[in-house]
Amino acid sequence: MPDALPQAAHYPFRDMHQAHCRRADLGATQLLTAFSTAAPGWAGALMAWRNRLVARFGLKTGPMQQAGTLSLQPGGHIGMFRIMHLGPQLAVLGEDDRHLDFRILLSVSPEAGGSRLQVETWVRPHHWGGWLYLALVLPVHWLLSKLMLRRMAQRLGESGSSGLLR
């Protein structure tokens, strides 16, 4: 297993969302491209506000690349998320910071009638401040991750219909 792939046991917080897409010919690169455009406009404003706030505490704010400047390879960035691994059906984004480390796993797998898209978030807080940060961002994280997955499935499956699995 490549070093960039996280080990689940090291991340005490994990969540996962899935969606079905009628396209069967999808790979991780298409997922990354869809991820890069799936955030609603308000998410960018929220991230800019978050960056101004957490910079005062010495936390990473990351580069905010625009969609036209994406580098879809390990070491590149999508927004403030560093691409840590890119395989045929799995992409791992993430960052390690003082308060916590996180990984976003984007995967696609074939299933009857198309593909299953899956987004997992894994977080390893380092201390109470990391747990506090996680508790504060979780409501927005859950809303945004579900919304982004739905938008990814819609964009990737424009030749057919798609929807969020419940």
Which ranges hold each PLM region?
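Hydrophobic ligand-binding cavity/cleft-lining segments
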Residues: 1-63
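A conserved amphipathic terminal alpha-helix motif
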Residues: 132-166
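Short hydrophobic helices that act as membrane-entry/anchoring signals
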Residues: 44-51, 55, 130-138, 145
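Beta-strand/loop substructures that line and gate deep hydrophobic ligand-binding cavities in soluble
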Residues: 98-135, 139
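Short amphipathic alpha-helical segments with coiled-coil-like heptad repeat character
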Residues: 39-41, 91, 150
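Intrinsic-disorder/low-complexity, polar/charged segments enriched in Ser/Thr/Lys/Arg/Asp/Glu/Gln
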Residues: 12-18, 90, 116-118
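Low-complexity, charge- and small-residue-enriched intrinsically disordered regions
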Residues: 58-68, 142-151
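Hydrophobic-ligand binding "helix-grip"
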Residues: 70-112
